[in-house]
């Protein structure tokens, strides 16, 4: 992998804000921060295309006392065995549980799984976090 140097023209104030942020985040130079921004854009583009193989997590908080939420949650996980890689279950208190579901597959299908999980009655909050499989990222 070769490195290419290029120039960017931006307002001074924007650069100063950027420098402050990357210093706060622990970057040692602008180049690595810019590379990470570009990588993030590539990953988001993969998800938008829908046909790319992607990875991610679906995190939900739900009330396990709610009628059928546990059964429906398990049924959905079994329905998508090829896409659901793993799950972590945490008891938050006597009523609420946190579930982190690791997924890998085509972006459109992963979004569909997340939508179905997040819309279950009894789910209080949820979020799909999208990332890459790492295969095509440099």
Swiss-Prot record:
Task: Print the keywords alphabetically.
Answer: DNA-binding, Metal-binding, Nickel, Transcription, Transcription regulation
Gene Ontology molecular functions:
DNA binding; DNA-binding transcription factor activity; nickel cation binding
Specify which residues bind Ni(2+) according to the UniProt entry for this protein: 78, 89, 91, 97
Cofactor entry: Ni(2+)
Q: Where is the signal peptide?
A: none
Disulfide pattern: none
Q: Name one Pfam family in it.
A: RHH_1
| Repeat is among the record's keywords | no
What GO biological process term is on the record, naming one? response to nickel cation
- Keyword hit for Lipoprotein: no
Q: What CDD domains does the record point to?
A: RHH_NikR_HicB-like
On cofactor binding, the record's note says: Binds 1 nickel ion per subunit.
User: HAMAP family per the record?
Assistant: NikR (MF_00476)
Protein family (similarity comment): Belongs to the transcriptional regulatory CopG/NikR family.
Known role: Transcriptional regulator.
Q: What's the protein here called?
A: Putative nickel-responsive regulator
Record organism: Pyrococcus furiosus (strain ATCC 43587 / DSM 3638 / JCM 8422 / Vc1)
């Amino acid at each position: 992998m070769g490195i290419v140097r290029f120039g960017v023209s931006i307002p001074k104030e924007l650069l100063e804000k950027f420098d402050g942020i990357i210093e706060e985040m622990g970057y040692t130079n602008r180049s690595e921060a810019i590379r990470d921004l570009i990588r993030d854009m590539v990953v988001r583009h993969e998800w938008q295309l829908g046909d790319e193989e992607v990875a991610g997590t679906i995190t939900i908080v739900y009330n396990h006392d709610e009628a059928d939420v546990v059964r429906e949650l398990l049924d959905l996980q079994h329905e998508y065995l090829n896409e659901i890689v793993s799950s972590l279950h945490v008891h938050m208190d006597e009523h609420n549980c946190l579930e982190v579901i690791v997924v890998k597959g085509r972006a459109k299908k992963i979004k569909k799984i997340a939508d179905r999980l997040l819309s279950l009655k009894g789910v209080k909050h949820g979020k799909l976090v999208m990332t890459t499989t790492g295969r095509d990222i440099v």
